[in-house]
Structures are given as C-alpha cells and as structure tokens.
Design a protein with these regions (language model features):
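Surface-exposed cleft-lining segments at the edges of enzyme active sites
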Residues: 130, 196-209, 236-238
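Catalytic alpha-helical scaffold of carbohydrate-active enzymes acting on polysaccharides/glycoconjugates
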Residues: 1-132, 137-185, 211-233, 241-290
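Glycine-rich, positively charged active-site loop/lid region within alpha/beta enzyme cores that binds
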Residues: 181-203
Length: 290
C-alpha cells in the first residue's frame, strides 16, 4: 500500500488532525423546539461548552497537540468566553452550522443564509473567519460544495471517501475544496454516548467498556500509522470530555505521541499542505456547457 501514502511535511510518516464537534445542545431537538420541554437534554448538551471544553483544552496543552473545533454559531453566541478560549489557546475554529442544521435537507439559498449568519457571529464573537466546515448531520446536498466555496471555505471534514485528504469539485468550475475525511470508527458517540435518563439515542446499546474503546481507537491509529495515512477524529466534548473519559483520551494521545514521525496538525494546515502538493489537480474544471 506504499503508493497510497501521501508526502507529509518534513518527511513525517503519518498525520493526525484531531477534530471536535462542539455541538452543545444544538441539533434536532433544538430545531424542532422539543429541547425546551426537556431540560435534561439541554443540560446533556450544554455540558460540552460549559464544563468539558476547558478540561479538553488543558489536556491538549499537556500533550502539546493542536486541534480543530467545529462550532455551531449558536454555541459561540451562547458561551462566548468558553469558545474564545479555543482561539486563545491556539486551536482552530471551523463552521458547523448555526444550530446544527441538516444541510442535506436545505435548499442552497437557506444554506447560504446559515453560512452568512454563522460567519457574522463567529467574526463578531470570536474574531475569526473560519476556512473549514464540517457538515452537521453527516451529509449535504449536491449544491453544498459551491455554497461553501462562495463563503470562503477552503476545506471540509464531512465525507468518508478515503483515508487521506482528497479534492471535491463543485458545479461552477471554481477551485475545489479539500476534503479531510473523518473516521466513524473514532466517533465517540458510537462507543460512549448511549445512556439512560434521558434515554438517548432511544433503544440503542449501552456504553462500551473504556478499555475496549481505547483498544479500538489505538488499532485505528496503528493502521493509519502503518500505511502513512491521515487520522481525523469525530469527537464531541459533551461525550468524551468527562473525567473518566479524559483518562481514555490521555492514554490514546500518549500512544500516538510516542510514535516517531507523526504530524499533529490543525485541519486548515492539512488542507493547505494538500493543495500545495496537488496544485495541478486543483485547477478549475472547465464546463462543457459554456
């Protein structure tokens, strides 16, 4: 599989781009209004920015690892001081909708409205203009790539099509987005988010053992490292940022840090590097109907 291995900066062997979705209490229950009748759901989500985020930022500082946080603008608006700490401590902010809207259900005009609203809030609240996007809900519509390009986005971390970054071309012939695919195998919801009181997600399995989760995640990294690829996570502070789970993350980061030749990078650094290495592939595609 050597032909699949990208060239990483400074002859590094593999890449790790830690990414967290700071959803807070946004999502379906907020969008349909039911969250306001279920305080337990709200507090389950608000734990992320209110309590877990600071713990995760301290952990990242201990291991000297940068990260990217995809933040719904409503969360930045509601917890500005907590979200400002992300920027102050040297990490990246990416777009993640306003209230975690399902982009795949929205017309392009509505997607543009959400991107513009999010850009204004994040600039005013945090002083940043993100260049990255992770789609809320895990999918998007055929028009989304062009919507993102119009909004000044340079990369996405939304799709699942490779173990390396790749290029996404839109319909309008503009330069492509870099896609930095996250890995469902390292989505903490799959292992750590099933619980009761409230029963969410309803009817699903109980929480996995922490030792088994650490073993799974370690094997995922080891496979990426062996083949010289890129590991991008789908972690959620409200899920993984609790005291017992921080120990799990610390053990995982310690294992990754102990390996030689791992480039730990913010997602925008990965995207910029990938575009520089694949400039020929990044040229606009001519439209045959023009």
């Amino acid at each position: 599989m050597a032909e699949l291995a990208p060239r990483w900066p400074d002859a590094q062997h593999a890449c790790v781009a830690l990414a967290f979705d700071l959803d807070g209490p946004t999502g379906d229950a907020m969008l349909n209004g039911s969250i306001w009748r279920k305080p337990a759901y709200f507090t389950l989500g608000s734990y992320g920015p209110w309590r877990a985020l600071g713990r995760l930022l301290d952990m990242l500082a201990t291991f000297d690892v940068p990260a990217t946080f995809f933040v719904p603008a409503w969360v930045a608006q509601t917890w500005p001081a907590q979200c400002a700490a992300i920027v102050e401590r040297g990490h990246e902010i990416g777009y993640h909708g306003y209230r975690h809207e399902a982009f795949w259900t929205l017309e392009p005009a509505r997607q543009r409205e959400i991107m513009a609203q999010s850009a204004e809030i994040l600039a005013r609240t945090l002083g940043v203009r993100p260049v990255g996007f992770r789609t809320p809900s895990g999918d998007w519509s055929a028009a989304t790539v062009d919507v993102l390009r119009e909004a000044g986005v340079r990369y996405s971390s939304s799709m699942r099509g490779d173990d390396r970054p790749y290029l996404l071309h839109g319909e309008n012939g503009e330069p492509p987005l870099v896609e930095i695919p996250g890995r469902w195998e390292t989505d903490d919801y799959a292992s750590l988010a099933y619980h009761r009181n409230p029963d969410y997600p309803a009817g699903l399995d109980r929480i996995a053992g922490y030792a088994a989760t650490l073993d799974n995640w370690t094997r995922e990294f080891d496979g990426v490292y062996r083949e010289g690829l890129c590991l991008t996570t789908l972690l959620h502070p409200k899920v993984c940022g609790k005291p017992g789970r921080i120990a799990l993350l610390e053990a995982w980061l310690g294992h990754m840090r102990a390996q030689d030749g791992v480039w730990f990078a913010r997602c925008h650094q990965v995207a910029d590097w990938w575009l520089a290495q694949h400039a020929r592939d990044a040229q606009p595609i001519p439209r045959s109907d023009r």
